[in-house]
Amino acid sequence: MSAQPKPQLMGHIIAGYPSFESSLYAALGICQAGASYLEVQFPFSDPNADGRVIEEACNKSIAQGFKVAQGFKLLHTLSQHINQDNKQPTRLIIMTYANLIFHYGIEAFIKEAKKCGVWGIIAPDLPIESDESLRILAKKHHIRIISLIAPKVSISRIKKIAKISDEIVYVVARAGITGEKTHIDKALFEWIRLIQKHCKKPIALGFGINSYEQVAALKDKVDIIVAGSYFVRFISELSTQSQLSPQDYMHKLQAHAQMLMGWDINE
């Protein structure tokens, strides 16, 4: 399946949740739907930007023994599948917290990510002023570091983040944590316009987007829709259905992605 028109979709799964195999099938289903990007979250014990749904999934993955090496194995397998199956492969993004990268070893992490077909990295808590040379090393290995712009930051801060973020900018739709519903209203549109005034890179809007009605209202406003809890919540629901075949599992995630975006499942 080739990538769909704007707004594009950035999906999200938790590596190892509810199992290694299930997280792979979930990822493949989202990719087959036509997602242009996929965040593969490496669980971290203190995910300060995440809401209850993602935090619980991360904790379960860690309790089951998740290791960074398993995350890379998942990405390597996923990369092989999507490069084989898709004319326009989904861009794979590792989403994790800075301490996990630092603990693994920055250059070792970047090199392994590159070997596994990773396109970019999002570390929500990574300060742009003190990244321990992560951006320099990532650039050396052609890995993009995507930065976040949160509400209520200054204009100068918006400009600085927009400049340093590679290729796209992740814009946080509202204050708070992931998963809580975001109201699509005048204030949000004004926030998006403010970013666009000072940033010419494509905007990925995330936090609390979980319905087609929200996506439709944002259609001409942003370039990329980021949906995290929307997928993780659905994956949690499917985890109780042990009789699902891998093919059924992938198809359900594919349909769930297409329902959010208003894409025809037969396209």
UniProtKB/Swiss-Prot annotation:
UniProt keyword list: Amino-acid biosynthesis, Aromatic amino acid biosynthesis, Lyase, Tryptophan biosynthesis
Disulfide bonds: none
A Pfam match: Trp_syntA
Enzyme class, first EC level, given as a word: lyase
Protein EC: 4.2.1.20
Recorded catalytic activity of this chain's protein: (1S,2R)-1-C-(indol-3-yl)glycerol 3-phosphate + L-serine = D-glyceraldehyde 3-phosphate + L-tryptophan + H2O
Pathway: Amino-acid biosynthesis; L-tryptophan biosynthesis; L-tryptophan from chorismate: step 5/5
Catalytic-site annotation from UniProt: E39 (proton acceptor), D50 (proton acceptor)
CC terms in the record's Gene Ontology section: cytosol
Molecular function terms, GO-annotated: tryptophan synthase activity
Assembly and oligomerization: Tetramer of two alpha and two beta chains.
Role of this protein: The alpha subunit is responsible for the aldol cleavage of indoleglycerol phosphate to indole and glyceraldehyde 3-phosphate.
PANTHER family membership: TRYPTOPHAN SYNTHASE ALPHA CHAIN, CHLOROPLASTIC, TRYPTOPHAN SYNTHASE, ALPHA CHAIN
Name of this chain's protein: Tryptophan synthase alpha chain
